[in-house]
């Protein structure tokens, strides 16, 4: 059997044993149990308000309960230890059964609830809550709550600190569920704190005023270290050849200046009055190239002027036709 299935089986068996003890030992003031399986057998610790009624005359009742445990739940050699409850009013299981019996005997639910919760607080409990749900009066079921002191409803404290017990009152109109929650005296809650008056507190050392910002501003600037001084900065020294990041292309010695070919591209001039800049062409024959470029520029100027005159003439002809 898998581990998780074994855990479920153990929990189911535990709840069934608890119900069995509640039915058999209800009149003795059953207050809960603890089950521990050992190599020598199954150890069961019973808590009861009246241990004598659990044991019976000459141990007759306890032997009967032991035989039924072996037959019904297949327990190996169950050993029952009966312990008396020191304060029954602080045991939620016993209080719930008492309240259920009072309701069955005809007590009014408010009187029974207030009387029970007052007895719990008088016993020293930090807080208590009683919840009655069912047909307490009339044909409709409802929930009635009685609160005193401090109670935790959720979280780890509610599981570890709060003692909870349930009981059932069988009435003519139906059943009434009884739930009792009790925080026992001396419980350590996570939000508790204490204020100690007589405590020796070490004196706090005051910081001298000279250690503040004003003292730093008042110091001589020569005494203040220069964090950003240039002495600590090292500048890498580079040669001029390393700084210049240009690629120099040497001329081919096999090609003469006469064999070099000068390529001229047409210049697009997009306006009538635009200035035409002189175009510098770098070559070995600087004198001849300059004269050639100047002649080409003059020819372009003449062509531009001629085109401008033609445009003006066309515009005048168009104006005359319109007139």
UniProtKB/Swiss-Prot annotation:
<dbReference type="GO" id="GO:0003735">
    <property type="term" value="F:structural constituent of ribosome"/>
</dbReference>
<dbReference type="Pfam" id="PF07650">
    <property type="entry name" value="KH_2"/>
</dbReference>
<dbReference type="InterPro" id="IPR004044">
    <property type="entry name" value="KH_dom_type_2"/>
</dbReference>
<keyword id="KW-0687">Ribonucleoprotein</keyword>
<keyword id="KW-0694">RNA-binding</keyword>
<dbReference type="InterPro" id="IPR036419">
    <property type="entry name" value="Ribosomal_S3_C_sf"/>
</dbReference>
<feature type="domain" description="KH type-2">
    <location>
        <begin position="17"/>
        <end position="86"/>
    </location>
</feature>
<protein>
    <recommendedName>
        <fullName>Small ribosomal subunit protein uS3</fullName>
    </recommendedName>
</protein>
<comment type="function">
    <text>Binds the lower part of the 30S subunit head.</text>
</comment>
<dbReference type="InterPro" id="IPR001351">
    <property type="entry name" value="Ribosomal_uS3_C"/>
</dbReference>
<dbReference type="InterPro" id="IPR027488">
    <property type="entry name" value="Ribosomal_uS3_arc"/>
</dbReference>
<dbReference type="InterPro" id="IPR005703">
    <property type="entry name" value="Ribosomal_uS3_euk/arc"/>
</dbReference>
<comment type="similarity">
    <text>Belongs to the universal ribosomal protein uS3 family.</text>
</comment>
<dbReference type="InterPro" id="IPR018280">
    <property type="entry name" value="Ribosomal_uS3_CS"/>
</dbReference>
<feature type="compositionally biased region" description="Acidic residues">
    <location>
        <begin position="270"/>
        <end position="303"/>
    </location>
</feature>
<dbReference type="InterPro" id="IPR015946">
    <property type="entry name" value="KH_dom-like_a/b"/>
</dbReference>
<dbReference type="InterPro" id="IPR004087">
    <property type="entry name" value="KH_dom"/>
</dbReference>
<dbReference type="GO" id="GO:0022627">
    <property type="term" value="C:cytosolic small ribosomal subunit"/>
</dbReference>
<dbReference type="InterPro" id="IPR009019">
    <property type="entry name" value="KH_sf_prok-type"/>
</dbReference>
<dbReference type="Pfam" id="PF00189">
    <property type="entry name" value="Ribosomal_S3_C"/>
</dbReference>
<feature type="region of interest" description="Disordered">
    <location>
        <begin position="251"/>
        <end position="303"/>
    </location>
</feature>
<dbReference type="GO" id="GO:0006412">
    <property type="term" value="P:translation"/>
</dbReference>
<keyword id="KW-0699">rRNA-binding</keyword>
<dbReference type="GO" id="GO:0019843">
    <property type="term" value="F:rRNA binding"/>
</dbReference>
<keyword id="KW-0689">Ribosomal protein</keyword>
<comment type="subunit">
    <text>Part of the 30S ribosomal subunit.</text>
</comment>
């Amino acid at each position: 059997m898998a581990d998780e299935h074994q855990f479920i089986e153990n929990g189911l068996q535990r709840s069934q044993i608890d119900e069995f003890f509640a039915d058999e030992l209800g009149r003795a003031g059953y207050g809960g149990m603890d089950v521990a399986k050992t190599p020598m057998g199954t150890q069961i610790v019973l808590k009861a308000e009246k241990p004598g009624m659990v044991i019976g005359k000459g141990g007759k009742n306890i032997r009967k309960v032991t035989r039924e445990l072996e037959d019904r739940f297949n327990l190996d050699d169950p050993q029952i230890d009966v312990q008396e409850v020191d304060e029954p009013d602080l045991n939620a299981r016993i209080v719930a059964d008492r309240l259920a019996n009072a309701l069955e005997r005809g007590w009014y639910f408010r009187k029974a609830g207030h009387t029970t919760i007052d007895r719990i607080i008088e016993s020293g409990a930090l807080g208590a809550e009683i919840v009655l749900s069912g047909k307490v009066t009339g044909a409709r079921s409802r929930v009635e709550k009685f609160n005193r002191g401090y109670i935790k409803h959720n979280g780890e404290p509610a599981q570890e600190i709060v003692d909870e017990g349930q009981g059932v009152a069988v009435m003519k109109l139906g059943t009434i569920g009884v739930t009792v929650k009790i925080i026992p005296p001396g419980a350590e809650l996570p939000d508790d704190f204490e204020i100690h008056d007589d405590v020796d507190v070490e004196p706090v050392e005051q910081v001298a005023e000279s250690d503040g910002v004003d003292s730093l501003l008042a110091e001589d600037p020569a005494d203040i270290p220069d964090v950003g001084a240039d002495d600590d900065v090292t500048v890498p020294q580079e040669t001029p050849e390393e700084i210049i990041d240009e690629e120099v292309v040497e001329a081919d010695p096999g090609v003469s200046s006469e064999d070099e070919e000068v390529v001229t591209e047409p210049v697009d001039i997009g306006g009538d009055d635009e200035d035409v800049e002189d175009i510098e062409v770098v070559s070995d024959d600087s004198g001849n190239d300059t004269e050639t470029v100047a002649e080409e520029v003059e020819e372009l100027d003449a062509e531009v002027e001629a085109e401008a005159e033609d445009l003006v003439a066309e515009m005048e002809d168009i104006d005359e036709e319109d007139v």
